[in-house]
């Protein structure tokens, strides 16, 4: 004996169901902020009331958490890209994270840790450089590399000059 299956639904899914499906597809690729998802829904033409309802539901079940997103983003970008606090704050702001959340997440990074990370980046690049008598080219490249990662000009120059001197001393031995 076979059980009969109910006939497939011929009605279209509601706008809210479509919006939820879109958000879930986007969230399977990577974590996203509430603002990112809201922007994608708006781009697809979903009304604000539908977007708000869907995003509130996703936040209630824990699929959207801007504070957790910001924490993971900072850890990942500091470890893999060597970004400074200033660059991380700009990236999070672009992603739509609230300023209070950004401030609290970045409060855990002190100036000493920032300097240590800059030194690590410079050391790793210096190992592959050939040092000539004129350090201007190497200095310019290393300071530029740190500047692109958001480090201040002052810190970048200090770190590069100190690490360049240390590398010269190490190679002499």
From Swiss-Prot:
Keywords: Cytoplasm
One GO location term (cellular component): cytoplasm
Record's signal peptide: none
Gene Ontology annotations of biological process type: regulation of DNA repair
Compartment(s) of residence: Cytoplasm
Family, per entry: Belongs to the RecX family.
PANTHER family: REGULATORY PROTEIN RECX FAMILY PROTEIN
Protein name in UniProt: Regulatory protein RecX
Record organism: Mycobacterium avium (strain 104)
């Amino acid at each position: 004996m076979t059980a009969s299956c109910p006939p497939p639904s011929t009605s279209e899914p509601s706008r809210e169901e479509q919006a939820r499906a879109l958000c879930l597809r986007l969230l399977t690729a990577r974590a996203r902020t509430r603002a990112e998802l809201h922007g994608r829904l708006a781009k697809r033409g979903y009304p604000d009331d539908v977007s708000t309802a869907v995003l509130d539901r996703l936040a209630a079940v824990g699929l959207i958490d801007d504070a957790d997103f910001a924490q993971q983003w900072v850890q990942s970008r500091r470890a893999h890209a060597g970004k400074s606090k200033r660059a991380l704050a700009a990236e999070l702001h672009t992603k739509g994270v609230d300023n209070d959340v950004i401030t609290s997440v970045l409060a855990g990074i002190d100036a000493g840790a920032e300097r240590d990370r800059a030194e690590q980046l410079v050391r790793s690049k210096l190992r592959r450089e050939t040092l000539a008598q004129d350090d201007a080219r190497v200095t310019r490249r290393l300071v530029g590399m740190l500047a692109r990662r958001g480090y201040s000009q002052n810190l970048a120059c200090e770190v590069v000059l100190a690490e360049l001197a240390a590398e010269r001393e190490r190679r002499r031995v």
